[in-house]
């Protein structure tokens, strides 16, 4: 069975990035280095440009100027998987067929063994033939996570993927994501300071002046909700966010 991520994944290098949409300049001369093989969370005020930055990194929105590449100097094109807030499962397909969607879109034969392995990893083996409408929100996000991993891409971009879930389900899916995404380069956008501190190796805060790093986090993710270090990190992060919001 193929592993989730065989080779050392690249980091993400953003250099002198500028983006203007219409008459609004979202960011200018932005520089950013995201460590390969680690989980990095990006937070900030609403409208700071977090989702726009992620879309530029993903190649969905062209930048006005600047350069984005892997830390190995190669383009990130073809090496990125995406997971958003909406699961975007096709209702007429089974869960297994949704997981294999990338193969279908490429006109390739589905790797059912790989899909079944991933469904087992996310606890959905018994739901492989079910339709999305029969699953809970948490189960659908598990399926979306398996679909993200199916492509075997080393870089995973996540735009608030857990925000629509109830607290307990969100905690469970956070833990699962931290476990199955080990060895990937992950960039997570979130407004939840606790989620960011629980899941991440590195924290970044985006404001009108650019992006700044937060103090290092203690321990390894996923951290327990009552971990003393997590609580201290969350307090420091909230203070930092309050500062950029002024």
For the regions a language model picked out, list residue spans one by one.
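Conserved ABC transporter NBD signature motif
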Residues: 65-80
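Conserved ABC ATPase "signature" region
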Residues: 110-127
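Helix-to-loop junction immediately C-terminal to a conserved catalytic motif
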Residues: 58
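Conserved ABC ATPase signature
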Residues: 131-135, 139
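Short coil-to-helix segment of the ABC ATPase nucleotide-binding domain corresponding to the Q-loop/switch region
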Residues: 93-100
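A short, proline-enriched helix->beta-strand linker immediately N-terminal to the Walker B motif
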Residues: 150-154
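Helical segment within the ABC ATPase nucleotide-binding domain
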Residues: 170-182
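The feature captures the beta-strand-to-loop junction immediately N-terminal to the Walker
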Residues: 43-45
């Amino acid at each position: 069975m193929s592993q989730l991520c065989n080779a050392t994944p690249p980091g993400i290098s953003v250099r002198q990035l500028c983006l203007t949409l219409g008459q609004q300049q979202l960011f200018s001369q932005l520089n950013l280095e995201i460590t390969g093989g680690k989980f990095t969370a990006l937070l900030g005020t609403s409208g700071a440009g977090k989702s726009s930055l992620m879309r530029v990194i993903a190649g969905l929105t062209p930048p006005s100027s600047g350069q984005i590449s892997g830390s190995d100097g190669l383009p990130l094109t073809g090496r990125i998987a995406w997971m958003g807030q909406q699961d975007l499962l096709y209702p007429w397909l089974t869960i297994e067929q949704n997981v294999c969607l990338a193969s279908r879109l490429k006109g390739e034969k589905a790797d059912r063994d790989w899909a079944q392995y991933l469904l087992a990893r996310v606890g959905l083996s018994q739901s492989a033939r079910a339709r999305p409408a029969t699953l809970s929100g948490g189960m659908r996000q598990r399926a979306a996570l398996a679909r993200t991993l199916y492509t075997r891409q080393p870089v995973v971009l996540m735009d608030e993927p857990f925000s629509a879930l109830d607290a307990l389900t969100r905690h469970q899916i956070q833990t699962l994501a931290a476990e199955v995404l080990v060895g990937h380069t992950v960039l997570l956008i979130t407004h939840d300071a606790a989620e960011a501190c629980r899941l991440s190796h590195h924290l970044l805060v985006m404001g009108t002046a650019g992006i700044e790093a937060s103090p290092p986090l203690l321990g390894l993710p996923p951290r327990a909700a009552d971990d003393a270090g997590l609580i201290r990190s969350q307090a420091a992060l909230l203070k930092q966010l309050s500062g950029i919001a002024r």
